[in-house]
């Protein structure tokens, strides 16, 4: 399954592992993964949560409190590697199922967020519900960000909002009067050139 993760998903899993190690926790749990999604550099999950009408910062504070409450280990396992707990694995399995229903070829961070929203057993799912983050709102926010694009590469997050970032909406500029009035008036410009070029 790991070969079907996007780069940002792999990065989030690695960040979750790093956070669990840093805090000397007994295992890597779903809460570590969600914290990694919230703190990921240029992450998509905070944008989706904010567009869904909640505060990603408020959720982050709740998750940090939950991480602080987890028990710590006095020493690391013999092999030095922490184990992923069952909930962590279940979230990834659920995310894979969600990716399949959206006809995406790779498991991306938005699929993991949707898996957390669907999960009513964890405190994360309950917190998201309390703050009004629903599956429909996230799917609408996702449609705003990625349009009708499917996840067909391992780095789709780089393509999201590319048009907004590197292009401009000419129709919107025309409506607001920001567009030069000459644009789109080729016939008028040719007529003026013909008149001016006469002797």
Question: PLM ranges: what are they?
Answer:
Residues 1-199:
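Histone-fold recognition with a strong bias for associated Lys/Arg-rich disordered tails
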């Amino acid at each position: 399954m790991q070969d079907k993760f996007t780069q940002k998903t792999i990065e989030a899993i690695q960040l979750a592992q790093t956070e669990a190690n840093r805090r000397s926790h007994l295992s890597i749990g779903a809460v570590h993964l969600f914290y990694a999604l919230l703190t990921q550099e240029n992450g998509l999950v905070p944008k989706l949560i904010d567009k869904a009408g909640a505060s990603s910062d408020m959720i982050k504070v709740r998750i940090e409190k939950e991480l602080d409450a987890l028990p710590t280990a006095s020493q690391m396992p013999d092999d030095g590697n922490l184990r992923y707990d069952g909930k962590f694995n279940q979230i990834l399995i659920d995310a894979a199922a969600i990716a399949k229903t959206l006809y995406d070829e790779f498991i991306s961070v938005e699929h993991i967020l949707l898996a957390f929203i669907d999960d009513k057993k964890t405190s994360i799912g309950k917190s998201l519900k309390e703050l009004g983050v629903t599956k429909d709102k996230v799917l609408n926010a996702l449609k705003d960000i990625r349009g009708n694009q499917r996840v067909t590469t391992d780095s789709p997050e780089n393509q999201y909002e590319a048009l907004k970032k590197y292009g401009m909406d000419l129709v919107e500029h025309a409506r607001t009067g920001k567009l030069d009035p000459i644009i789109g008036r080729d016939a008028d410009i040719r007529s003026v050139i013909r008149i001016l070029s006469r002797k």
